Amino acid sequence: MVIPTRDRRGLLLRALRSVLSQRSIELEVLVIDDGSTDDTPDAVRSLHDPRVRVLRHEVPRGVATARNAGAAAATGTWIALLDDDDVWAPDKLVRQVTAAQRASARWAYAGAVEIDGEGRLLGGERPPSPEVLVHQLTRRNLMPAGSSNVVVDAASFRSSGGFDAGLRHLADWDMWLRLARYGHPVCVPEPLVAYRLHTAQATLDTRGMIAEARVLRDRHGADLNSIRRWLAWSHLRRGRRREAVGAYARAVASGDLRSAGRAAVAALHPRPTAARRRPPNPADVEWTESARAWVRAAAED
C-alpha cells in the first residue's frame, strides 16, 4: 500500500499505525516522502517495522507522481492508497480484497466517515452503490474519502496508466473514470475509512478545477455543467455563499438554466446549506456510530 506525505509527521504516524494494525493480510507499506523538510523519514524509520519502506523525492513532485512512484515500487497483487491524514479500520483491507476476489472485481471501495483535526467523529452517510457511483462519474465524484478508500488490482492500476500528474485537483476523479472501463467496483458498505476535514479545506480553486473538468469532458465525456453544479454545491457545504453564486452563475451563462434557481437560493437564503438540510436518518446515525470505537482508537497517540 502507498502513502504519499510531505511535512506532516504527526498525522502520518497515526495513518501508519492504522495501516500496520490491519488484520489477516500481508502488507508492504511504501511511504513516499515528497520533499519533506521535517524529520518525517527518521520518524518512519523509528517504527522499526520491516513492512515499511521510505522512498524519498528530494524535490516535491506532487501527490499524483508520489502515488505513481509508490505503485511502481509495489510488489503485491493489490494496491491500496491512503492520504497521510486519513485512517483505516483494522479490517479495511482484508474485507475489500476478499469482496473484490469473490466478485471478480478489479477495484473496491467502502463506506467512509468524517473526522475533525483531532480525530473526533463528525458524521457520515452510507456509500453509493457501485451502479450509482459509476453512472454518476461523468457528473459527480461520489467516491467517499477519495483515494484513501480505493483498493485496485495492481495489473489494472498499471495498465490504466496511473494518476495523471498534470491534474492537480481532479486526478482521483480521472482515475475512477478510467478504472470504470474495467467494470464496476465492489462496495463494502460498512464505514472502514475516516476522512479528515481541515480548516484549509474550506477553499476551492474553482478556476483550476473547471480547467481540469474540461480535460475530463474531452477525455471521458464528462458533463461540464454538472461539474459546475457540483463545485457550487461544494462551496455551499463550506458556507461560501458568494463563491457558490458565482459558480451557479457561470453555469447559467454557459446555457445551464437549471442552475438559475439554485443561484437564487444560494444568494437569498441566509444559511444556504440549511435550505436543503434534512433531519438525519436514524439508520445513517447508527451506521456512523458503528465506526466510533475504531475511530477513537486511531486518534490515540
Where in this protein do the model-derived segments appear?
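Short, acidic, metal-binding catalytic loop of nucleotide-sugar glycosyltransferases
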Residues: R17-E26
